[in-house]
Curated annotation (Swiss-Prot):
It holds the Pfam family RrnaAD. S-adenosyl-L-methionine binds at residues 30, 32, 57, 78, 108, 126. This is Ribosomal RNA small subunit methyltransferase A. It is found in: Cytoplasm. Keywords: Cytoplasm, Methyltransferase, RNA-binding, rRNA processing, S-adenosyl-L-methionine, Transferase. Specifically dimethylates two adjacent adenosines (A1518 and A1519) in the loop of a conserved hairpin near the 3'-end of 16S rRNA in the 30S particle. May play a critical role in biogenesis of 30S subunits. Belongs to the class I-like SAM-binding methyltransferase superfamily. rRNA adenine N(6)-methyltransferase family. RsmA subfamily. It is an enzyme of class 2 (transferase). One of its GO terms (cellular component) is cytosol. Transmembrane segments: none annotated. It catalyses: adenosine(1518)/adenosine(1519) in 16S rRNA + 4 S-adenosyl-L-methionine = N(6)-dimethyladenosine(1518)/N(6)-dimethyladenosine(1519) in 16S rRNA + 4 S-adenosyl-L-homocysteine + 4 H(+). HAMAP family: 16SrRNA_methyltr_A.
Length: 298
């Protein structure tokens, strides 16, 4: 007897048994089996028939079906070939009218350079917990068209993503995400709605894209790559003053102190006290002095 609608615990286990799936921790495979949780995520994302949604790590299709239920198109990026091959069949069986609105991309999300088809408008995903931050930043970098999103991540990671300057947990993820977007925590998800049950709680983060800081008045030579190099250096040792943390980029702490002061920032401040706008101003001063090249990690 065929089933329709969203997945439940029984259908999750049935599909897993059919394809011989044994969830692995290395790929962060924990599948949501609670329809109320799925609909809650979709409701928070506020997507509908006008949207084309990126979903990273669709797994067995719980959230995919919830997104398709709204009338949205879904581009599902899945690294596991067995899961990627199964997903269209699951959608065709449980939500036949939505099958044509699903596109599956078999790939590691970090290897994706372009999202196929029409421009996406949103990112909604239960991100693999072991790579959640790099995947989120990568999707923001390669696809500037999407403007809103909701992601489910480990609770501790959710706290770090939304942390403000001055917080003990404010760091590289918080600062880099703030370059692209405003992020707020919008909910908690208990372990009991997953199979297998993880040993951590989960959190929901809503993302609203915005223009990078100082876009209008910024020196055009300043790039995201440069800003992220300074972010990495500023947080490499939380106890270091900024002049010491950036000494390697500036040719010494004295030169760093002069350049940081020129940016209107206290060189004795620590990275954890600075927002992304402050760090962008530091980069601008460094770039104007020729202290930075345009190389470095995104």
């Amino acid at each position: 007897m065929s089933e329709t609608g969203l997945l439940n615990p029984a259908s999750i286990r049935r599909i897993a048994d059919q394809i011989g799936l044994r969830p692995t921790k290395t790929r962060g495979q924990n599948f949501v089996h609670d329809a109320n949780t799925v609909r809650r995520i979709v409701s928070l994302a506020q997507v509908g028939a006008a949207d084309r949604v990126i979903e990273v790590g669709p797994g067995l299709g719980s959230l995919t079906l919830g997104l398709l239920e709204t009338g949205a198109e879904v581009v599902a990026i899945e690294i596991d070939e067995v899961l990627a091959n199964q997903l269209p069949g699951t959608v065709a069986e449980r939500m036949p009218g939505a099958a044509e609105r699903l596109e599956v991309v078999l790939s590691d999300a970090l290897d994706v350079k372009v999202i196929p088809g029409a421009e996406p408008t949103a990112l909604v995903a239960n991100l693999p917990y072991n790579v959640a931050v790099p995947v989120l930043l990568h999707m923001l970098a390669i696809c500037p068209q999407w403007s809103t999103g909701v992601v489910m991540v480990q609770s501790e990671v959710a706290d770090r993503l939304v942390a403000a300057p001055g917080s003990k947990i404010y760091g590289v993820p918080s600062a880099k995400l703030a370059w692209y977007a405003e992020a707020i925590r919008v909910g908690n998800v208990p372990p009991t709605v997953f199979w297998p049950v993880p040993n951590v709680d989960s959190g929901l983060v809503r993302i609203t894209r915005r223009r990078p800081p100082h876009v209008d008045g910024r020196d055009p030579r300043v790039t995201r790559s440069q800003v992220f190099r300074v972010v990495d250096a500023a947080f490499a040792s939380r106890r270091k003053m900024l002049r010491s943390a950036l000494a390697g980029l500036c040719g010494g702490s004295m030169a760093a102190s002069e350049l940081i002061t020129a940016a209107g920032i206290d060189p004795t401040a620590r990275g954890e006290a600075l927002d992304i706008g402050d760090l962008a101003r530091v980069v601008e001063a460094l770039a104007q002095a020729g202290a930075l090249s345009d190389s470095g990690q995104v």
